[in-house]
Regions:
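Ligand-binding "clamshell"
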Residues: 62-74, 89-90
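A conserved helix-loop-strand patch within extracytoplasmic ligand-binding domains
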Residues: 74-123
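Short, well-ordered beta-strand elements
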Residues: 1-9, 27-33, 100-101
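Short, hydrophobic alpha-helical packing/hinge segments within bilobed ligand-binding/sensory domains
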Residues: 39-41, 49, 113
Length: 149
């Protein structure tokens, strides 16, 4: 029995297809779904899982550094697309001064979100912030957006 932890969608959905194919090859796969990004790594570190499937390499590296864990990547997979959704506002250009913008609360995905906001001209980050950018790296915020993690 191979036990893999995954986020519900798309990862667990993908594993459900793989489970059928693995069964044909004589393998049993158990999929444990997690709705957060911490538990699958702590479960893997403690030996409750054989593998997990939900994160990109920058997140894994940051998790190991922050939590002092020893997880390793088994290989590369697809990279989740990331987008900006205007919510109640019809377009990003229509965002009002002082509007609240939510970003992920983990280091690498927060940085990705901030880089997208910068690409849209909504904020400016200090030079070199890259995939470690946080709210503290915002050097220009003309619309005075409230960035909420």
């Amino acid at each position: 029995m191979i036990v893999i932890g995954a986020s519900p969608s798309p990862h667990a959905d993908i594993l459900k297809v793989a489970k059928k194919e693995l069964k044909k090859e004589g393998y049993e796969l158990e999929i444990k779904e997690y709705s957060d990004y911490v538990q699958p790594n702590t479960a893997l570190e403690s030996g409750d899982l054989d593998a997990n499937y939900f994160q990109h390499k920058p997140y894994l590296d940051d998790f190991n550094k922050q939590k002092k864990t020893h997880l390793a990547s088994a290989g590369t997979i697809h990279y989740e697309p990331f987008g900006i959704f205007p919510g109640k506002t019809k377009t990003l250009k229509a965002l009002k001064n002082g509007a609240t913008v939510a970003v992920p609360n983990d280091t690498t995905n927060e940085a990705r979100a901030l880089l997208l906001l910068q690409d849209q001209g909504l904020i400016k980050l200090k030079d070199g912030a890259g995939l470690t950018a946080t709210k503290k790296d915002i050097v220009e915020n003309k619309k005075d957006l409230a960035i909420k993690e």
